[in-house]
């Protein structure tokens, strides 16, 4: 069973609209781990968050039996190593390494580049969109012949890449630019449908209407025009 003892205490400091927080919820839910969610205000950081993550001062933070772990990719690996049921990383050493590679690629390349679309206009925005599409094409090719980036079932890279499936593709609706058009990325759109068919994913992603309202509000606060 996922829960190894009745005395285990698992808490997650997160924020409901954060893709980095939500990926931890997905992993814990997939593993069947009970946890307490502590919603954080990222604009007014709590003393608890600053105490548990004094280095980065950011969410998410997983607290397992009083011990804090920060950074979402690190937390995901910890969860997989601690609760062995429903593994999200492959057993094969090469495949595990490649899962780590693609996860870092999503966070450090796709996410960082795609978020620059927000606030850009004209030729600057067009250049960012093209750069993002060039990066997304690597995922498009990886998905050929697969139901998920992890193969036949939901895995580590899929959980990480939900920020593409839901956050990026919802943000493009707000900014009025199709970064991931279906005619250019049919495999990614097929993969998104597969994600939406997964009960854990459906349970753990933010409700679309509330999420869109949040994105719009954030953009207004930053004086960024939406479509």
From Swiss-Prot:
Residues 92-215 form the GST C-terminal domain. Disulfide bonds: none annotated. Its EC number is 2.5.1.18. One of its GO terms (molecular function) is glutathione transferase activity. The keyword Cytoplasm applies. Keywords: Cytoplasm, Detoxification, Transferase. One of its GO terms (cellular component) is cytosol. Residues 8-87 form the GST N-terminal domain. One of its GO terms (biological process) is response to salicylic acid. Transmembrane segments: none annotated. This is Glutathione S-transferase U7. It comes from Arabidopsis thaliana. The gene is GSTU7.
